[in-house]
């Protein structure tokens, strides 16, 4: 029998559905979970051979949290626009005066890679401080070849610097590049012919996303991008049905999407197509709150048809300027009436599915990477009850305690 590196005893844990289990033990060897289950069934040789033991005193251990939808890499901020919004100035007027997403695009283009790292790293570290061990980071504030690739390179570097697993998503189809104003189709053609192949060839993109909406890209344009991604063997995601029902979720499902995100205006047909594709619904309560939206995502429908629900921060300067996944968990339970187990699964197992990583992370199961968080609480409901609190007692990444 092999000796194990770490033995965690007397713990409360959660399963993949978010249900809490008591009197649990976890055996860790070579960065992965060697055994887990009820402590009274723990094989004796693990007790005898463990190099290190930790009595958790009944405290909660969860998988490392996963933020599966962020726009963490950008320069500057839009606090001045927020002041104008509070004074009643419309988004259209703000955009006409040079604000909105294109202001972030300009600041991001003007920033060097070093400056982007300096501004973005604290955001990633703030997530890590909450027990987040895996983060998805999208591009989408470059909107040209040079700057989209720059954003993806920075995202990769941030993961290495912070000790957080980062998955990158190419979101060149976030808005039309300013050089192509009035000719969105020419921009889409350039994206498909030049930008996306370059991101693939440089191994900078793990997935491809499209903002499919009347103010962004049409169904036909989204399909062109999805087909290009498919040809490049890149999985897809979609900003879908956020402001209206365009059928983007059904289109994305047809291309085997990992996830469809936002979904406030999702209908039954779209939900059923997501079930067929095994796509995850990524709900973003931060954007719902910050934009003062009235239409909630159809959580009851998603439950009824069996679509898995994930939660993410959508961290970005325009519609969700937050770096707290814990706060999103509280918001999801309050705004969207999600149960405690649903919320816990949404930031662990379902979030791993949204990234196509469920075989390696997202749940406490034998063979998976030992990304774990030990909390100074015994009741899992506390993670949703408090606002952005408590912080982890300790976090483990791939079998090593990092905090």
UniProtKB/Swiss-Prot annotation:
InterPro entries to which the protein is assigned, alphabetical: Amidohydro-rel, HutI, Metal-dep_hydrolase_composite, Metal_Hydrolase
CC cofactor note: Binds 1 zinc or iron ion per subunit.
One biological process term in Gene Ontology: L-histidine catabolic process to glutamate and formate
Annotated binding of N-formimidoyl-L-glutamate, by residue: 141, 316, 318
Keyword set, alphabetical order: Cytoplasm, Histidine metabolism, Hydrolase, Iron, Metal-binding, Zinc
Catalytic activity: 4-imidazolone-5-propanoate + H2O = N-formimidoyl-L-glutamate
Gene Ontology cellular-component terms listed: cytoplasm
Cofactors demanded by this protein: Zn(2+); Fe(3+)
Binding site for Fe(3+): 69, 71, 239, 314
EC number: 3.5.2.7
HAMAP family: HutI
Protein name listed in UniProt: Imidazolonepropionase
Organism: Legionella pneumophila subsp. pneumophila (strain Philadelphia 1 / ATCC 33152 / DSM 7513)
């Amino acid at each position: 029998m092999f000796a194990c590196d770490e033995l965690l005893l007397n713990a409360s844990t959660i399963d993949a559905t978010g249900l809490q289990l008591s009197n649990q033990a976890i055996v860790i060897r070579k960065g992965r979970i060697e055994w887990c289950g009820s402590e009274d069934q723990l094989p004796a040789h693990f007790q005898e051979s463990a190099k290190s033991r930790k009595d958790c005193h009944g405290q909660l251990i969860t998988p490392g949290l996963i933020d599966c939808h962020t726009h963490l890499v950008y320069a500057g901020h839009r606090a001045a626009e927020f002041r104008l919004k509070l004074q009643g100035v419309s988004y259209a007027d703000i955009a006409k005066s040079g604000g909105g997403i294109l202001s972030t695009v300009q600041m991001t283009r003007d920033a060097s890679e070093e400056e982007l790292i300096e501004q973005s790293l604290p955001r990633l570290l703030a997530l890590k401080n909450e027990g987040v061990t895996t983060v998805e980071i999208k591009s989408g504030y470059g909107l040209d070849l040079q700057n989209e690739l720059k954003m993806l390179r920075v995202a990769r570097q941030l993961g290495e610097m912070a000790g957080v697993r980062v998955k990158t998503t190419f979101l060149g189809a976030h808005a039309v590049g300013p050089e192509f104003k009035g000719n969105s189709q020419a921009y889409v053609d350039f994206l498909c012919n030049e930008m996306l192949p370059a991101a693939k060839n440089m191994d900078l993109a793990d997935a491809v996303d499209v903002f499919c909406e009347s103010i962004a890209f049409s169904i036909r344009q989204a399909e062109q991008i999805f087909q290009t991604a498919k040809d490049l063997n890149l999985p897809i995601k979609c900003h879908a049905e956020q402001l209206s029902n365009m059928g983007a979720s059904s289109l994305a499902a047809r291309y085997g999407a990992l996830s469809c995100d936002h979904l406030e205006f999702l209908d039954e047909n779209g939900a059923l197509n997501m079930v067929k594709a095994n796509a995850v619904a990524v709900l973003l309560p931060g954007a719902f709150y910050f934009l003062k939206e009235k239409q909630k995502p159809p959580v009851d429908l998603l439950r009824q048809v069996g679509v898995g629900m994930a939660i993410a921060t959508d961290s970005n300067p325009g519609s969700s300027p937050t770096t707290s996944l814990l706060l999103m968990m509280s918001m999801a339970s309050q705004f969207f009436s999600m149960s405690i187990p649903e919320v816990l699964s949404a930031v662990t197992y379902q979030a791993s599915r949204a990234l196509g990583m469920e075989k390696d992370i997202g749940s406490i199961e034998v063979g998976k990477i030992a990304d774990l968080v030990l909390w100074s609480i015994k009741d899992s409901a506390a993670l949703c009850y408090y606002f952005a609190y408590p912080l982890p007692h300790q976090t483990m990444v791939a079998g090593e305690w990092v905090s």
